[in-house]
């Protein structure tokens, strides 16, 4: 299945050349129809397996936070699990597919809007390039208190210095 979603040329295996760039070999190649079929099968199955291994029941799960590849895939997973779509975190309509960041972004949003609370039984489920997939069950905890806030001005200053040093 790795040929269905991959980057044909990359890294030291096939470094960039004029020919590989001209042929678009450093961009993601995807057979959308087959990836959709795969994703709709594994999202539900992986969630069920994780819930079973945690010795939970499906009705105990407060929210499922899936990879946000495509809303239709999430809807198909909901149908496969026989759950209302409201049990799923969905933000792909706001941000599109944010790749590996989609689950953490959705989790933060669910906390911010009160849908994900302390002690909620939660499933995180995703799939990706090479048609890998996985799911994990978590009992949500409160965030650790921060000692101090991040000093954005300092990091922007460091970024300007780094940018300057890369140009000289």
Predicted regions and their residues:
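Acidic-glycine-rich active-site phosphate/pyrophosphate-binding loop
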Residues: 12-21, 73-85
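Phosphate/pyrophosphate-binding loops at sites that engage ATP/ADP/AMP, CoA/4′-phosphopantetheine
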Residues: 45-62, 110-115
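Glycine-rich phosphate-binding loops at beta-strand->alpha-helix junctions
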Residues: 61-80, 95-97
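Conserved phosphate-binding/catalytic loops in two-lobed NTP-binding clefts
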Residues: 84-98, 115
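Active-site-proximal alpha-helical scaffold in enzymes
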Residues: 100-116
């Amino acid at each position: 299945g790795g040929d269905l979603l991959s980057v044909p040329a990359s890294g030291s295996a096939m470094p960039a050349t004029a020919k590989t760039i001209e042929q678009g070999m450093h961009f993601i190649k995807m057979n959308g129809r087959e990836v959709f079929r795969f994703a709709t099968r594994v999202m539900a199955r992986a969630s069920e397996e994780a819930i079973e291994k945690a010795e939970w029941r499906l009705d105990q799960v407060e929210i499922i936070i899936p990879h946000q590849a495509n809303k239709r895939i999430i809807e198909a997973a909901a149908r496969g699990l026989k759950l209302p779509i409201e049990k799923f975190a969905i933000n792909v309509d706001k941000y599109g597919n944010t790749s590996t960041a989609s689950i953490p972004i959705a989790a933060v949003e669910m906390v911010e809007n009160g849908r994900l609370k302390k002690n909620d039984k939660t499933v995180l489920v995703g799939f990706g390039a090479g048609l890998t997939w996985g799911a994990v069950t978590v009992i949500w905890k409160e965030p650790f208190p921060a000692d101090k806030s991040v000093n954005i001005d300092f990091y922007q200053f460091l970024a300007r210095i780094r940018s300057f040093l890369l140009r000289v």
